Amino acid sequence: MKQLCCSCLLWLGLLLAPFSQEQEEVTSPTKLCGRDLLVEVIKLCGQNDWSRFSMEEQSPMTELVPQYTRKVKTFNPHRSSSSWGRFTNPGVSQKKATHTWESQSLPNYQLKKEELLPKTGVHSYHGGKPYVKSVKFQKKNTDKMSTFSGLFWGNHPQRKRRGFADKCCAIGCSKEELAVACLPFVDF
């Protein structure tokens, strides 16, 4: 009886071993540099099974910019005439629609005139004092940006310069981190 129980546990362990290696493979960071990194990203982005990655929950783009969550429709001239509805009369055939383009009127955008510097005559060297305030304001804004960058990256100038590829080469990247490279190709 004891021998039967041990053999069952051994078989169970052998059956679960491939699954545990697969989970470990997903979470463990691997150092990838240059061509190896590119090949791994291509393999990952080319997979049809995205169920292992819950990108909708972890996607920084959908959290920061909510309009990325909507579907984007692309224009394909080989579709039925319903996709041509914006540019043509729906009663016209597709062949005729390609030769006669009846465009609808475009929306009128209200453009805001940009605040330009006041037009004056010749400025002397001392007459440029109003512009000193704008330069100080610009300097203050750039200081705020560098403060934000410092909070995000910390006080490490190397981290600020290090890109995604350098990080994967020096430290290593897991498959979840590599999946970020596929975001431009994912249809949300």
From Swiss-Prot:
Gene3D superfamilies: Insulin-like. GO terms for molecular function: hormone activity. Residues 53-158 form a propeptide. One of its GO terms (cellular component) is extracellular region. It comes from the Eukaryota. GO terms for biological process: apoptotic process; ectopic germ cell programmed cell death; fertilization; flagellated sperm motility; male gonad development; negative regulation of apoptotic process; negative regulation of developmental process; negative regulation of reproductive process. Disulfide bonds join C33-C169, C45-C182, C168-C173. This is Insulin-like peptide INSL6. It comes from Rattus norvegicus (Rat).
